[in-house]
Amino acid sequence: MSTERIAILPGSYDPITKGHVALIARAAKLFDRVVVAVMQNREKQYLFSSEQRVRLAEISVSEIPNCTVLADDGMLIDLYKRLGACCVVKGIRNDTDYRYESVQAEWNRAHLSSFETVYLPADDAFVAVSSTEVRNRLNEGRDIRDLLMPEAAELVLSEEFWKA
């Protein structure tokens, strides 16, 4: 088994926000390698395709040297085993997040006893930042630049991005 401490930060990232990036940057200081896992749930509707979500994530975390991005449509516990991860990191903005993530963590641990979940509280500056807010603003024609990393925001706002 590798001595490298690998943390997975799974999410739909539809799209990845400044709040996500802040959490990823914090995790990158705690672990040898962080893997941003853009997950695909067949029962969920996404605004952005898997390829678009990966591209936005790669652009957004490009300044974090020990961070990689991948897409996965399988079970998180399978990815955890495949990567030899030491934990999954989840950001917590409020009690609702904690309750939801606790249920997920219990299920994962029940199915893989070595599965660990680490909770990091969201930075106060990003508590109100969410992918849902980005999607709502896009639907309403409102500005999203304060919610996304600059290059990601410009890409989302470009016509070429939507033709891909």
Language-model-derived ranges and their functions:
Residues 1-164:
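Nucleotidyltransferase catalytic core that binds NTPs
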